[in-house]
Amino acid sequence: MGIKKYKPTSAARRLMTVSDFADITKDSPEKSLTEPLKRSGGRNVHGHITRRHQGGGHKRRYRVIDFKRRDKDGVPAKVVAVEYDPNRTANIALLHYADGEKRYILAPVGLSVGDTVFAGEGADIRPGNSLPLQNIPVGTVIHNVELKPGRGAQVIRSAGTSGQLMAKEDRYAQVRMPSGTVRKVLIECRATVGQVGNIEHEIIRIGKAGKSRWLGIRPTVRGLAMNPVDHPHGGGEGKSGQGNPHPVSPWGKKTKGLTTRTNKRTDKFIVSGRRQGARSQ
């Protein structure tokens, strides 16, 4: 899939880029695999904002993705379409199974219409096939990885991301995450071979504020530009500094430069931390 640029007919158009959607083969989703998507605008049941910068955007229907594929072991599935999914950065592939059922999966790099994919221990090491980690050779590029057997894939699902199977020791496999972290995962957990498709997503430039609003992203206002009643950094005459020894959140918690990982319970599964300067996944 390539990147489309526009003639500079306006300041926004000058730098705006979009995907050319060359890999997309079907315009409308499979209706039986969609559900209504009720959105909250970042509010909880009391109407209070619990997630900032969220709301508005184009109306969407949720595409039901099969992140498990365990009940289709050994059943061949033919790829009949590659579709755009507004709810995620990756594209999705529509599968027609030999038993007549239809399902969506994430579309990896190299998967095209007409290909056949399998799931199960005996599946080949080919993009789109889903296998337990114990049946995948060390060094294989993978995505869509489970963290608990049977729960379904939870990590390495964004466009262009991939992990790598680094080693197998006893009950655990070591998987290198996109962040550089090497993590232990039970060898019974499943993963899909290959890299998640739509790899050009990270170089797309939104170009204008209005396009962010189409995507359901509301503006992010600096605390320094607020009043003291709204943010600890607010107030002052002119362009004064934020005035705190360390930058803080709107609720007074220290922010910026601090580790965001607080799940000590799973620290024992981290073999090595993320590389310096890497973006969190």
Swiss-Prot record:
Residues 27-38 have a biased composition (Basic and acidic residues). Keywords: Ribonucleoprotein, Ribosomal protein, RNA-binding, rRNA-binding. This is Large ribosomal subunit protein uL2. One of its GO terms (molecular function) is transferase activity. One of the primary rRNA binding proteins. Required for association of the 30S and 50S subunits to form the 70S ribosome, for tRNA binding and peptide bond formation. It has been suggested to have peptidyltransferase activity; this is somewhat controversial. Makes several contacts with the 16S rRNA in the 70S ribosome. Belongs to the universal ribosomal protein uL2 family. GO terms for biological process: cytoplasmic translation. Part of the 50S ribosomal subunit. Forms a bridge to the 30S subunit in the 70S ribosome. The keyword Ribonucleoprotein applies. Residues 27-59, 225-281 are annotated as: Disordered. Residues 45-59 have a biased composition (Basic residues). Disulfide bonds: none annotated.
